[in-house]
Amino acid sequence: MRDYVLRATSGNGQVRAFVATTRNTVEEARRLHETTKVATAALGRTLTATSIMGLMMKNDSDKLTVIIKGGGPIGTIIATSDSKGMVKGYVGNPQVEVEDYPNGKLNVAAAVGTEGVVKVIKDLGLREPYNGTYPLVSGEIAEDFTYYFAVSEQTPSVVALGVLTKEDEVEFAGGFIVQLMPDAEEETIAKLEENVAKLPSITNMLKEGKSPEDILNIVLDGLEPKILDTCEVGFMCECSKERVKTALVAIGKKSLAQIIEEDKKAEVGCQFCNKKYMYSEEELLEILKEM
């Protein structure tokens, strides 16, 4: 089944909702980076949220990057999305292992850490990208995005993100972001709070085979949910030999000349998709000449 995000509102327009199924996206990330279960969960949750946040942007050329540094053994988590919800991402230590919670659930916070920041960079085509840094509040990812929306955008939000992995494969992944609009009335707020209070976990809903449409109807029960559109999303890296070349330029003339002299070739990998690019001595000399 393809990955997609539903964009919806309540009948009165006072609540907006984004509900995603991202199993293929997260599985592709797991396959490319060979992540452990807990790293897959941390990266998968971040990719799902980043994809939805990408769809919140207005212009086609807008780009969004999320960087999570929690001080934990997973290292830095980086995810980036375009305005169509197409994402890519990676973690510093894809082989991280931590003890599960006593109930058997993955302890994502132990891998991510709880002392750190969430950084959100929005490139809206202006001279300077918008750059915001916010404290990490839990390390479980969903709560951290909830806090980000409350503080950065003054938008009360409910964020739920889930990834379920069996053996070496992602079984289910998805999530939702539901937000109150500034004109939301008490009645709407009370109903949404009532719904959220009795919600099963997103992982359980996905495990039960519930589609984004089903989840939307549960979250916005009694609020007449109205689907505005359905956006197909996925993992996409637009790297190329030409783009990756910037890494060779960045090391400087002296280091590049040393590589040419000692190795006569260079291999450069893309961090987002792990694709490797080989540069021959001739190509390296050409790059050096252009510097």
Swiss-Prot record:
It comes from the Bacteria. InterPro entries: Heat_shock_Hsp33 (IPR000397), Heat_shock_Hsp33_C (IPR016154), Heat_shock_Hsp33_N (IPR016153). Under oxidizing conditions two disulfide bonds are formed involving the reactive cysteines. Under reducing conditions zinc is bound to the reactive cysteines and the protein is inactive. GO terms for cellular component: cytoplasm. GO terms for biological process: protein refolding. The keyword DNA damage does not apply. Disulfide bonds join C237-C239, C270-C273. SUPFAM superfamilies: Hsp33 domain, HSP33 redox switch-like. Keywords: Chaperone, Cytoplasm, Disulfide bond, Redox-active center, Zinc. One of its GO terms (molecular function) is unfolded protein binding. It is found in: Cytoplasm. Redox regulated molecular chaperone. Protects both thermally unfolding and oxidatively damaged proteins from irreversible aggregation. Plays an important role in the bacterial defense system toward oxidative stress. Belongs to the HSP33 family. This is 33 kDa chaperonin. The gene is hslO.
